């Protein structure tokens, strides 16, 4: 998950001057700085004149100082100035709303609402209260202030922003496009539209829209950052970092970029490198930092740490629901907790069946996961097959797709997916080896399954693999490898089922050699196995005699047929 925001403030910007005209008055300098959005310069000028008690023409210093400080993201300074203004008799009550905006930016929503309500009834007050209601999840107030919005550009921009934050990206796009049709000079709205398409996973469309803005504003920090995020989704981390380098270079020369966002996204682009150093301080600064730290812990099998980070998070966005579902799935399996698994199923089903998500890749992954937990593998395959072209190199997808195929009897497809897995970590898992061996055996590739067993070290898992090998090979009449597996099992544990299994498999090999379906060499191997059983059970004459009888029949036939080992 990436942070696609990124506000900037101009640094050391040279003022634009018209040929033959030089502005010298402080008012002209201040006006020029404000028009160029060089709020750092404006703040510096105003603070100088304030501390030296010099007038700035007829302009009131404090209101403009607070305005400039707010827009350069020095909110604490802006708050101090507004408090000073409001302590004076006859102050403009609009400053209560301005101070409310400062509290809103700081995340102090109760204070923001208190200040806003002290101000006059106006469109700015409505917009501020509208955003506060959205941030505090007060649906009743949100509806009230929504109805008070007018068709002005400012009010409609607020509506678009709230749609965006609530995950209603298509509705936000509709608002922004309507404004663009009416007021084409608001070209920066293309960035907002591009951000919505990014959130909807339309990364190529997002880039196309974004380039409209970048053609005329190629040093926009927000646009560059969003472009790098799109490159990450479309290509890889290296391509994304190359785009972000443009922003880092601008930081050194032209802009003071919000370093937190750059640092956060670099961690993502570098696949979690330095995550434990960079992300924890950003948990309450960059919203995506918490989610990415959870992902880092999951990748490193630190399930408890991931759970602690996300357990109190009330999910709003689909990514939050999905991640919380995944963490609960891990905890549920580890603790055998039906409560956690129930939460997992509810969240996966909620996102996967949502109208806005059901036809997206994450939405279909959610439905596949939901049915996987229910062990409803036919439905799992419906969803996984629909998105398979997007995950041909994803080991986790190939693994789960292979399991679902094998569980529904599609063993050829299962073998194809499971053999495509490259991760050594996945290949070492008992579950993976079990499903792959079963797929090999069911596709008449029993030797491949036997080779997997031969590479295993002696353990409880290898014993279980032998049992699977013996039984599955017997079922599909791969009697030679069934005999080899039962032979090892019998030597490890002389249980009756292994003895009977070995006798049956050896007779099966004899029948197949007799019918020309199995090479003669296999029968000679079987004769050695039978001879070993005769010796192993010397203290149990009944069992020993059974093996000896089978061996005698085979030897007589071999002699009569003049069969020779190749």
Swiss-Prot record:
InterPro entries: TPR-like_helical_dom_sf (IPR011990), TTC26 (IPR030511). GO terms for biological process: intraciliary anterograde transport; intraciliary transport involved in cilium assembly; protein transport. GO terms for molecular function: intraciliary transport particle B binding. Disruption phenotype: Defects in new flagellum formation. It is found in: Cell projection, Cilium, Flagellum. TPR repeats lie at residues 59-92, 94-126, 153-186. One of its GO terms (cellular component) is intraciliary transport particle. Keywords: Cell projection, Cilium, Flagellum, Protein transport, Repeat, TPR repeat, Transport. The keyword Transport applies. It comes from the Eukaryota. Signal peptide: none annotated. PROSITE patterns: TPR_REGION (PS50293). Belongs to the IFT56 family. Component of the intraflagellar transport (IFT) complex required for transport of proteins in the motile cilium. Component of the IFT complex B. This is Intraflagellar transport protein 56 homolog. It comes from Trypanosoma brucei brucei (strain 927/4 GUTat10.1). The gene is PIFTC3.
């Amino acid at each position: 998950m990436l942070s696609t925001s990124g506000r900037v403030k101009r640094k050391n910007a040279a003022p634009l001057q018209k040929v033959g005209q030089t502005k010298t008055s402080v008012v002209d300098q201040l006006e020029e700085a404000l028009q160029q959005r060089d709020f750092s310069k404006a703040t510096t000028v105003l603070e100088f004149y304030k501390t030296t008690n010099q007038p700035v023409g007829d302009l009131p210093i404090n209101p403009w100082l607070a305005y400039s400080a707010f827009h350069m993201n020095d909110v604490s300074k802006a708050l101090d100035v507004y408090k000073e203004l409001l302590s004076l008799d006859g102050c403009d009550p609009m400053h209560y709303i301005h101070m409310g905006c400062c509290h809103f930016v700081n995340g102090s929503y109760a204070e923001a609402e208190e200040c806003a309500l002290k101000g006059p009834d106006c469109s700015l007050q409505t917009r501020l209260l509208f955003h506060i209601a959205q941030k505090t999840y007060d649906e009743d107030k949100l509806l009230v202030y929504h109805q008070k919005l007018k068709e002005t550009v400012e009010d409609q921009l607020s509506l678009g922003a709230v749609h965006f934050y609530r995950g209603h990206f298509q509705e936000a796009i509709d608002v922004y496009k309507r404004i663009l049709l009416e007021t084409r000079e608001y070209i920066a709205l293309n960035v907002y539209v591009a951000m919505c398409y990014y959130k909807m996973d339309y990364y190529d469309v997002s880039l196309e829209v974004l380039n409209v803005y970048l053609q005329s504003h190629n040093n926009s920090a927000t646009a560059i950052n969003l472009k790098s995020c799109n490159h990450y989704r479309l290509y890889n981390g290296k391509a994304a970092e190359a785009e972000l380098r443009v922003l880092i270079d601008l930081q050194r020369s032209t802009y003071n970029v919000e370093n937190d966002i750059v640092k956060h996204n670099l961690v993502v682009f570098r696949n979690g490198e330095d995550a434990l150093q960079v992300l924890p301080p950003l948990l309450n600064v960059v919203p995506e930092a918490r989610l990415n730290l959870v992902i880092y812990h999951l990748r490193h099998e630190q399930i408890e740490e991931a759970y602690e980070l996300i357990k109190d998070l009330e999910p709003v966005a689909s990514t939050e629901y999905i991640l919380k579902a995944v963490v609960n799935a891990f905890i549920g399996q580890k603790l055998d907790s039906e409560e956690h698994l129930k939460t997992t199923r509810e969240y996966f089903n909620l996102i996967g069946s949502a109208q806005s998500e059901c036809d997206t890749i994450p939405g279909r992954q959610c439905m596949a996961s939901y049915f996987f937990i229910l062990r409803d593998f036919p439905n799992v395959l419906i969803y996984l097959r629909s998105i398979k072209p997007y995950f041909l190199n994803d080991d986790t997808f190939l693994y789960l797709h292979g399991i679902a195929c094998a569980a529904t009897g599609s063993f050829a497809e299962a073998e194809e997916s499971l053999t495509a897995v490259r991760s050594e970590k996945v290949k070492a898992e008992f579950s993976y080896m079990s499903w792959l061996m079963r797929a090999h055996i069911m596709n008449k590739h029993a030797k491949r399954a036997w080779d997997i067993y031969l590479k295993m070290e002696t353990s409880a898992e290898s014993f279980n693999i032998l049992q699977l090998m013996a039984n599955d090979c017997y079922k599909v009449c791969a009697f030679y490898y069934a005999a080899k597996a039962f032979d090892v099992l019998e030597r490890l544990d002389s249980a009756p089922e292994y003895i009977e299994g070995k006798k049956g498999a050896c007779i099966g090999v004899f029948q197949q050699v007799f019918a020309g379906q199995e090479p003669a060499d296999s029968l000679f191997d079987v004769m050695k196995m039978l001879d070993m059983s005769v010796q192993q059970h010397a203290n149990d004459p009944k069992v020993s005699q059974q093996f000896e009888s089978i061996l005698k029949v085979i030897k007589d036939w071999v002699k009569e047929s003049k069969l020779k080992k190749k």
